[in-house]
A protein has these predicted regions:
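Long, charged, low-complexity, helical-prone intrinsically disordered regions
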Residues: 2-407
């Protein structure tokens, strides 16, 4: 058998364009939906299609991350509108409508456009071929879960007879382990949630027939995902592109030449980069969004990229012991004028939005942070805003005064 051909990065194509760091930043902002008029007609589903993946997380401060992502781009979007856009429930007694999205492992646990189902065939195959899992399953548990879903229709883990014993993943029941494994294999899918609980169904019943296949080989899956990641990023290094859907660098290397992305150089990056050719056709212009960002937003979820593009060091501290936190439990980066200008660690107390800690790079950012807090307060039905701490007492007083003038 002939040895497989492996492409490496030792020989790189000539760059088709040279971008300044500022041009790359604006291309990235536009690609992520933060430059120009919001696509309100496309709405939440348009945001999902544009980004290709929206990360899920259980933390809920102002809102959950999958709600914060469309809010950051569109403004005040009703939570029911968000949930219905992602998870359209099937009417009782009728055939399920075509789902708009499904949940799967991408950058992390994510909501993905249903059209991307075929692209993850490579990952489903890898999971099926995996020899070891963290949990051993009792004999017959997996088959029983599939049999029950086939007979009874879409069910939560509780409906199946076994959710988590505790909140920790390592203490899942056998049924929960089985249904989650079936989801990773692609035999089961989640296209709906009820009260934040996943609703599981057979993929053959929930995924549209035209998409329900694993026909794409691994190379084609990777090529498409690299192309989509490049489009969603606008411009990125190999590591940026790989991180978007958690691919390996060698997987990106193997397909990037055939992905449709074009090689570019970006001043100051010091690494080869690739761009979406459509992103290079027009100069990024338009109005910038001023908003709070979820730490799980795809604009900032890659720490190395965020630091390179924005000069902003970002780290989620929710899992850091409280005495060691620098910026707060759920510090949200503040985007204003196309730059990250500070952080706000928010919470809610009744109808009061509390900025537990505000960290700003400059007093000049106070008006933008005040605007972001006022919009967020309106969105979550808070009528007052309180600033507990800032990185200097003067900043706290100035921000409080600015907010009081607008409330």
């Amino acid at each position: 058998m002939a040895a497989p051909i492996v492409r490496t990065m030792t020989s790189l194509p000539r760059p088709t364009a040279e971008l300044s760091a500022d041009e790359a930043r604006r291309i990235a902002l536009r690609a992520q939906g933060f430059l120009g008029a919001p696509d309100r007609r496309g709405g939440v589903r348009g945001v999902l299609r544009h980004l290709g993946a929206v990360q899920l997380d259980t933390i809920s401060v102002l809102a959950r991350s999958h709600e914060l992502v469309p809010y950051a781009r569109l403004g005040a979007v009703g939570r029911r509108t968000v949930d219905e856009a992602y998870w359209t429930p099937a009417p009782v007694g009728t055939a399920p409508p075509r789902p708009h999205a499904f949940e799967y492992w991408s950058h992390a646990a994510c909501i993905l456009p249903v059209e991307e189902w075929p692209h993850f065939a490579f990952r489903r195959r890898a999971y099926r071929a995996r020899p070891h899992w963290n949990h051993a399953l009792p004999d017959g548990t997996y088959d029983q879960v599939i049999k029950q879903l086939r007979a009874e229709g879409p069910l939560t883990a509780t409906d199946l007879g076994g959710a988590k014993k505790t909140s920790e993943w390592w203490d899942w029941s056998g049924t929960k382990v089985a249904v989650e494994r079936a989801l990773m294999y692609g035999e089961v899918v989640c296209t709906e949630r009820r009260g934040w609980k996943r609703v599981y169904d057979l993929a053959e019943r929930a995924i549209p027939e035209a998409l329900l296949h694993d026909d794409l080989d691994d190379t084609e899956c990777l090529r498409r995902l690299v192309r989509l990641a490049g489009r969603s990023l606008g411009v990125g290094t190999r590591a940026d592109i790989a991180d978007y859907h958690r691919l390996r660098n060698d997987q990106v290397d193997a397909v990037i030449a055939d992905s449709g992305l074009v090689p570019v150089t970006v001043q100051g990056w010091g690494k080869p980069a690739w761009a979406d050719p459509e992103a290079l056709e027009t100069t990024p212009r338009g109005r910038h969004r001023t908003t709070l960002l979820s730490p799980f937003d795809s604009l900032v979820w890659d720490r190395a990229r965020t630091e390179r593009i924005f000069g902003f060091t970002h780290r989620l501290e929710a899992y850091v012991p409280k005495p060691k936190r620098v910026y707060g439990y759920f510090a949200m980066p503040v985007l204003a004028g196309g730059r990250l200008v500070g952080r706000v660690d928010p919470s809610r107390e009744g109808t009061t939005l509390v900025a537990k800690q505000v960290t700003l790079d400059s007093p000049k950012s106070v008006p933008a942070v005040a605007q972001a807090l006022l919009e967020a307060a309106t969105w979550v039905n808070c009528t007052t805003i309180r600033v507990d701490r800032a990185n200097t007492p003067l900043l706290r007083d100035t921000l409080t005064t600015t907010l009081n003038k607008s409330l």
